[in-house]
A protein has these predicted regions:
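N-terminal/domain-start segments enriched in small and hydrophobic, helix-friendly residues
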Residues: 1-3, 88
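Conserved PLP-binding catalytic core of the aspartate aminotransferase-like
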Residues: 5-6, 16-51, 67
Length: 88
């Protein structure tokens, strides 16, 4: 299971590297702290929740452009990456 999570985290990093308006803090955990340009994080959070994809927003003013996105199964990774790609 750890190998799958590591593989999916790497996949998410590669996909985010290819996206405009998205960056992330490299992680050794099972999530990525993902930063979006402008106020995109709030809009993305709301749109992802409507799709049944739950990510964690932050109320701290320094993190208002950020979402914590957990690394999951290959299917979950595909779902979240496709949703974000469609929304940005």
């Amino acid at each position: 299971k750890v190998a799958i999570l590591l593989e999916q985290r790497k996949r998410m990093e590669q996909e985010f590297d290819a996206m405009d308006r998205v960056s992330y803090v490299p992680s050794h955990g099972n999530y990525l702290l993902t930063r979006f340009d402008d106020h995109l994080a709030t809009d993305l959070y709301e749109a992802l929740v409507k799709k049944g994809i739950f990510v964690r927003p932050f109320s701290d003013p320094r993190l208002t452009h950020d979402l914590r996105i957990s690394v999951g199964t290959p299917d979950q990774t595909t779902r979240v990456l496709e949703a974000i790609s469609d929304l940005i």
